[in-house]
């Protein structure tokens, strides 16, 4: 009886802990009917200038960010080397906490403290987020650059969401405009011979 009672008391606490620790999933391209204002959007591009021993080129698997007001965590699946994202969020300050890079079966993560603000209403362009990935090595890094390509971005917005064609779009780029972060590989590693964990140097 005591064991059952203890479980009943502990179970709600476990649920609360799990709900606080889990990130709320957001679509990167919501349906037209699901759009609400305020809306923020931007473009993500990932590339690697130096050659790599891996078959697959890097792409952004997902990014995580949190609200500074209520500490709620969000996760957006991107799964592309180049893609726009559109997010309907509550007004306030937000900070990106982590991004995940994927190369075939390999995954790595980096903490990138980008910040952005969501206004009380309207549509805001957050800029182009450029992720330059170092080739695989033991001290791999990621360079993030924030650029403005507002004309191209607004065209993409109006083509994808015609109902917003007459909406005034404000520009408020994420900050800082340049940062570097360490990339850490995420286990487990793929068990394929044609994958190279690091360059053979």
What is the predicted role of each segment?
Residues 1-22:
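Sec-dependent bacterial lipoprotein signal peptides
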Residues 81-88:
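Short, surface-exposed beta-strand/beta-hairpin micro-motifs centered on an aromatic residue
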Residues 10-11, 30, 80, 109:
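Generic detector of short alpha-helix boundary/capping microenvironments
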Residues 70-81:
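Short, acidic Ser/Thr/Gly-rich low-complexity loop/linker segments typical of extracellular
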Residues 22-68, 101-201:
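Primarily secretory-pathway and cell-envelope proteins
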Residues 90-97:
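A short tyrosine-centered beta-strand micro-motif
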